[in-house]
């Protein structure tokens, strides 16, 4: 009889572990057709990692993720992805500011250093998150584009805990038409972002 009770106790514990999610198995959320998940990873010398996962269009080249000037002490430095024609599409500089307790995104001191200045700044809500969106001009003579097509970027700043991150998305517009980007696509990309530390 005692053996039966012990077996029941063991099975009960196993069932509780299974239903409480205490297993090594992780469900992978598959992106919609035409989309893919990529990871930007910043690593410190001590082995700590920051990962920004994001869902992006499939025509972007998953194997092209590049690093520029990454700081091995602060989880910062530019990581970006190109499309399959080698044109920069989007990226992040990792952690760009740290908020004090009680501060919000509006209080963040962000040293953006845009070479051509900022065309506009506004705060927008997408889902449950608030973003600061800086609209900037990148240049007026993009490689491989007609001379009247300029390159712009929307730089989105957002908070996770007390950390401020950025995520930028490039797009093209005819001369000064800075509002020519695909609004739903950019919102979808932003909504998919997740941050993890390991």
Regions found by a protein language model. Name each.
Residues 56, 92, 153-154, 189:
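Residues that flank catalytic or metal-binding motifs in active/ligand-binding sites
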Residues 9, 22-80, 163, 168-198:
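N-terminal targeting sequences that direct proteins away from the cytosol to non-cytosolic compartments
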Residues 106-161:
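Signature of long, low-cysteine stretches enriched in small and polar/charged residues
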Residues 45-48, 70, 85-89, 142-149:
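Short, solvent-exposed loop/turn segments that connect beta-strands within catalytic domains
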Residues 76-108:
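A short acidic-to-branched-hydrophobic micro-motif
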Residues 1-20:
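Sec-dependent bacterial lipoprotein signal peptides
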Residues 84-85, 98-103, 137-141, 160-161, ...:
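Short, flexible beta-strand-to-coil junctions
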